[in-house]
Amino acid sequence: MLDVNVFDELRIGLATADDIRRWSKGEVKKPETINYRTLKPEKDGLFCERIFGPTRDWECACGKYKRVRYKGIICERCGVEVTKSKVRRERMGHIELAAPVTHIWYFKGVPSRLGYLLDLAPKDLDLIIYFGANIITSVDEEARHSDQSTLEAEMLLEKKDVEADAESEIAERAEKLEEDLAELEAAGAKADARRKVQNAAEKEMQHIRERAEREIDRLEEIWQTFIKLAPKQMIRDEKLYDELVDRYEDYFTGGMGAESIQTLIRGFDLDAEAEELRTIINEGKGQKKMRALKRLKVVAAFQRSGNDPAGMVLNAIPVIPPELRPMVQLDGGRFATSDLNDLYRRVINRNNRLKRMIELGAPEIIVNNEKRMLQESVDALFDNGRRGRPVTGPGNRPLKSLSDLLKGKQGRFRQNLLGKRVDYSGRSVIIVGPQLRLHECGLPKLMALELFKPFVMKRLVENEYAQNIKSAKRMVERQRPEVWDVLEEAISEHPVMLNRAPTLHRLGIQAFEPVLVEGKAIQLHPLACEAFNADFDGDQMAVHLPLSAEAQAEARILMLASNNILSPASGKPLAMPRLDMVTGLYYLTLKKSPEEFGGQGAYQPADENGPEKGVYSSYAEAIMAYDRGVLGLQAPVRIRLDHLRPPAELENELFPEGWNQGDTWLAETTLGRVMFNEILPWNYPYLEGIMVRKGGGADKIMLGDVVNDLAARYPMITVAQTMDKMKDAGFYWSTRSGVTIAMSDVLVLPNKDEILDRYEAAARQIETKYNRGKLTGRERYDRLVELWKDATDEVGQAVEDIYPDDNPIPMIVKSGAAGNMRQIWTLAGMKGMVVNSKGDYITRPIKTSFREGLTVLEYFNNSHGSRKGLADTALRTADSGYLTRRLVDVAQDVIVRVEDCGTRQGVRVPVAAEVLDATGAVSGYTRHDLIETSVSGRVLAGDATNAEGEVILAAGSDLTELNIDLLVEAGIQQVKVRSVLTCQTPTGVCAKCYGKSMASGKQVDIGEAVGIVAAQSIGEPGTQLTMRTFHQGGVGGDITGGLPRVQELFEARVPKNLAPIASADGVIHLEDEGNFYTLTLVPDDGSDNVVYDKLSKRQGLASIRVPMEHNPAAFIERTLAEGDHVTVGTRLLRGAAAPHDVLEVLGRRGVEQHLIDEVQAVYRAQGVAIHDKHIEIIIRQMLRRGTVIESGSTEFLPGSLVDLSEAKLANSEAIANGGQPAELRSEIMGITKASLATESWLSAASFQETTRVLTDAAINKRSDKLIGLKENVIIGKLIPAGTGISRYRNISIKPTEAARNAAYSIPTYGESIYGDDGFGEFTGASVPLDEAF
């Protein structure tokens, strides 16, 4: 057996008949499977034990040899080898065919490889192979030439004979006619009768003449055909062929069926053909050249690979092992069998019948028919349904052939190799576990016992609770009390992995430390929900157990939930407080006036009535006052603090040297805000403001910003602890805030009718004008839509104004916990305009709110939008999943392979934006809007210098937040950064060009699978976009841009509303041609004018930005007009430019920027942040190849697609050897096409078009170097990414116990004011990644 981990590449090729016979253990001669009485396999049949091995371990078929001691003996009675029955999964047989057959993949695939090789049209091939026409395989030119005069003389003689025969026949007939006429005359017949006889005779003589002529023509045709006879000539006329064979069989050979094809292939000279084709390519033009190119691809493939083309015609076919096409007995005594057995049986039956007929010497026509049937049965076995009607089984179901076993989602590749099931796993419903730490999950006791069974059994024996494993197993099954104690020990320090389907990004599977819980539901930490996109309405999750020490270490260090707080897509925190927690923190940090509840005991300055009130000497004193009920949680007070760091401005003012713990300062704040700051690390600057999740403003602090800042300043462990404290505080205070929703909280607008009456009157006016013909239908529609939108807005504003701040509904919205103001308008104001099935607004709005209830008509109008939202979601979720699959496939081999590729190239990105004062002059600089997604986390490619030329940051510096601020201060508007688009690493990318990992905030590790992370980062929000449409009230919220636009871009398709682009800088001239414009571009450089005709008026001309006349610093937008000056690459119509056009006009960098901007535009419109580097990785894969224009002295074929890095190597080799380099043109490929063009045939075959990819790979004898992830998963090796790359594989360390304890020690969280709340004690945290251990 092969050791699975020892080979480096996997090659696929064409098998010859000898190979097939060599693999085989014997010939299958009979179509029988098993004996119906004994149920034993039949001898020489499809399940024969002599060929495939014994059905029982160490036992021959007749029972003479039993037991392992006879291992390897071949029984002399039944001929079966005594061995394990497992060999029936690996031993192959074969069928010797009585006549050769072609392999359907090579003949029927598109393009037909056989057709290209032999230069035959697929239609003709079909006729030959299926016995519809004859083909000449060889002609003895010399013999024909030397005997030509003799043969010609013979032919002339034959013609003369035919003529002479005809003449004599005609003479006889004339004689007979004379006799007949004489008789008639003697009998006194009338002239009429005599004429009849004469006419009949003349007709007969005419027939004789015509027959002779036909025969002579036929002879002439036979002779002419014979003289011009050439190999590969088809003769469809069977009689003509028979005549040729009868007369001249010594001078040529020919025939029909696969046999003649085989003869042609055997006599085929690859080298000569390749030479000839190259000549045609160099000298020819047009169609001829194109065909030669296509043919050369196939011919050169055989030439290069050393494959024997005869392998495309089979003399023997392999029979796969019987265990892979099993026959199983069902309950009713009937048998179920794999379709392959049926297909093999047909082949064997027809083959045996053909053998018998050949032996009996049956007529050729019968033999040919049987050969055709054999060919069809082999076709059905290899690829059923590829040609003609598929072979069907019972119930008219097409049988599954060998090709069908590989294809599609249910095929071998995707179902069994890439989609394996996993042992040591379980699944259950999830419920919330608010008492858990961030790195913990609650595991049901029963599930844990089953998962950890082997560990528990081992410990039971070790701790001497059980004598042996068997009794330990019994103890576990009976759930003895001591089992639970041992289980506690077994699960400690042993992380488990939780996964929620659909796993859209890498945070869909994370590791947690299990905590045993009662019940049968898994408990999930509330902060982990966002990453899993989980909620507790019946979602289920799967649990997986890492077994080996390495797997456990990996789960704990790389996958622990507390180490995965940041999103790999944008670097923003995902484990954020949400929903109740946000409400709780919002309530905790509110500020109220003394009159309101919670505002009692507020600060009052000293006056004549006494000293100041609401001042506390310490936090403890304030807590005491709160406990007594004197002080409200949200009352503005002054508290002297010494254990919290003051805000930055205050610190600079009070403690110029810097604040130290113990230094006191007076905080003007509320007790709630001090409590919130208690949660944060002690040296984090004090936060004074209301905590909200979204919608900032004065006195409001975004929780996201806080978590972001924490993640940047502190180690992950501190962030995780702080997040947990936030969660506890959030739940604690949201419970105590009493925020609930009841019908009575939805306040109804008292003056709503008055507002609506006003708008009703205006609507009636519009209708009247329309009825009088003063408005067109379109104007009426536009005005009514505008009017009712204003009405909805006015009612909405009025609703917002009547809600007091302490009403729970605005509290939930303002804190950013859930919902938005629009939803409150719908609840309490009015729903407004809705859309009909055509997508137009219905001009009667929904005037009622949900609180009042809709009328029947309004309900009906509303139903369409709601349904469309749900239907769209279902459809687009599937679309998004498919997009993710294609993205993953195209980028799966992009792995960080080296530290630095050493390039000085890069791309320019914006850093600072100018701030203009009232006069339009630059008054300063601010951070550019796109810094988050395009600049942060990169490495400088060149020095960043200011206007004076001073170097602010040297090349190679990381663009951290601090460094970016330096650049903005210096007024540097653009910098050149390293990018994967310009990375010079031949396979994968280098760490410097990639920059920092968004998920860790540190430079990316070598071995990181950045390609897959990129694909997930783009695909995951794709699903989010598609899932989040219906929240915006049905149809109004749909985006056509959305997913279809992203797909269009990544597939590099011509967009739906195509806009041509200017191919040069120049001035435009417009001509109106009715429904179209003709636009002429006059280039500035004086080159030829470019004419764009048939530009649709409906699409409309593009808009351009032009400076205002009186203020050139300001710009206005207007549509293109006569005489406008445009720059290269400007769109000329509204719509989108085609990526191929952009590549042609603006070059590689232009199309890269175009794609990034367009993709980002779609995501930004949805408020989704994705870093540019992820999109860049996909674009790099799309632009990896080029078309060979001139091959120079390289091996490349003109017109073929080659990898640019490969071409670079080949060119440098050619130049070094004094040859000519190849000329290439950059190509942009859609992601599907790029995936299929990948070097790895395993990866391409498992993606799409499996049979086509394998056919191609086999002809080229492709070798898969196993550098991507997919290939290695398929063959069951560790993936070459992460800890699977060789530099991490070949180390062995054994830490001491002390080191292990230090590394895995779990610090406690210390005391907390929420500790005694019945939520349980808190211990546990993540592994501190920052310690070098």
Swiss-Prot record:
- Cite a single GO MF annotation: DNA-directed RNA polymerase activity
* GO biological process terms, semicolon-separated: DNA-templated transcription
- List ligand-binding residues for Mg(2+): D535, D537, D539
Annotated Zn(2+) 2 binding sites = C901, C983, C990, C993
Tell me which InterPro entries the record gives.
DNA-dir_RpoC_beta_prime (IPR045867), DNA-dir_RpoC_beta_prime_bact (IPR012754), RNA_pol_asu (IPR000722), RNA_pol_N (IPR006592), RNA_pol_Rpb1_1 (IPR007080), RNA_pol_Rpb1_3 (IPR007066), RNA_pol_Rpb1_3_sf (IPR042102), RNA_pol_Rpb1_4 (IPR007083)
Question: Which keywords, in A-to-Z order, does the entry hold?
Answer: DNA-directed RNA polymerase, Magnesium, Metal-binding, Nucleotidyltransferase, Transcription, Transferase, Zinc
Where does the chain bind Zn(2+) 1? Answer: C60, C62, C75, C78
The record's GO CC annotations read:
DNA-directed RNA polymerase complex
Q: Write down the required cofactor(s).
A: Mg(2+); Zn(2+)
Cofactor detail note: Binds 1 Mg(2+) ion per subunit. Binds 2 Zn(2+) ions per subunit.
- Detail the disulphide connectivity of this chain as listed in its UniProt entry: none
Catalytic function, reaction form: RNA(n) + a ribonucleoside 5'-triphosphate = RNA(n+1) + diphosphate
Entry EC no(s) = 2.7.7.6
Q: How does it assemble?
A: The RNAP catalytic core consists of 2 alpha, 1 beta, 1 beta' and 1 omega subunit. When a sigma factor is associated with the core the holoenzyme is formed, which can initiate transcription.
Instruction: Please give the family membership noted in the entry.
Output: Belongs to the RNA polymerase beta' chain family.
Q: What does this protein do?
A: DNA-dependent RNA polymerase catalyzes the transcription of DNA into RNA using the four ribonucleoside triphosphates as substrates.
The name on file for this protein is DNA-directed RNA polymerase subunit beta'
Query: What gene name does this entry carry?
Result: rpoC
